[in-house]
């Protein structure tokens, strides 16, 4: 898996000060995408053990609220194995002390269909994240005042063990 960038002190991609990994690879190609260069799965840098260690080191800082996975799309099919490794590692090390947010262009219903069709890796990812921001960015529905979203069709889902908490 490749990634475009890592931000180690971000406050716009989730609650609190966060470490944000922008992965490469996206099938959605949303009009007006904030990171169009990340559509190409080969863009950027190779994700390595050293990259993971840098993320873990930043999460060990007391100021850091957690990890956000964005992109591109972390749930781009070719990214899922590595993203599963990342969220499993972070959850295993920090439990509920650090939250994990994940942004995807897929909707909750689309993801549930993929799980029903046998995507075990996707189910594992959803079980290990705390917040899912779903839905494609729709330029015509862009709202500057939205918190943690780009367009008003996108939804913020709080999850426990892969299930929505209302």
Q: PLM ranges: what are they?
A:
Residues 1-3, 17, 35-120:
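Conserved Radical SAM active-site core
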Residues 2-29:
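N-terminal pre-triad scaffold of radical SAM enzymes
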Residues 6, 72, 135-136:
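Fold-independent oxyanion-binding glycine-rich loops
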Residues 12, 109, 165:
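Flexible, glycine-rich phosphate/dinucleotide-binding loops
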Residues 26, 74, 137:
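Hydrophobic pocket-lining residues within nucleotide cofactor-binding pockets
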Residues 118-119, 123-166:
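Classical nucleotidyltransferase
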């Amino acid at each position: 898996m490749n990634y475009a960038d890592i931000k180690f002190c971000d406050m716009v991609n989730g609650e609190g000060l966060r470490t944000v990994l922008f992965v490469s690879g996206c099938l959605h190609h949303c009009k007006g995408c904030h990171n169009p260069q990340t559509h190409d799965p080969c863009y950027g840098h190779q994700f390595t053990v050293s990259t993971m260690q840098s993320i873990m080191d930043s999460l060990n800082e007391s100021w850091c609220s957690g990890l956000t996975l964005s992109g591109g799309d972390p749930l781009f099919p070719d990214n899922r194995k590595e993203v599963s490794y990342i969220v499993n590692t972070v959850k295993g090390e920090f439990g509920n002390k650090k939250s994990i947010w994940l942004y995807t262009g897929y909707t909750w219903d689309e993801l549930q269909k993929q799980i029903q069709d046998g995507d075990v890796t996707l189910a594992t990812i959803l079980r290990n994240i705390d917040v899912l921001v779903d839905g494609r960015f729709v330029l015509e529905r862009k709202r500057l005042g939205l918190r943690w979203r780009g367009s008003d069709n996108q939804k913020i889902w709080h999850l426990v063990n892969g299930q929505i908490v209302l």
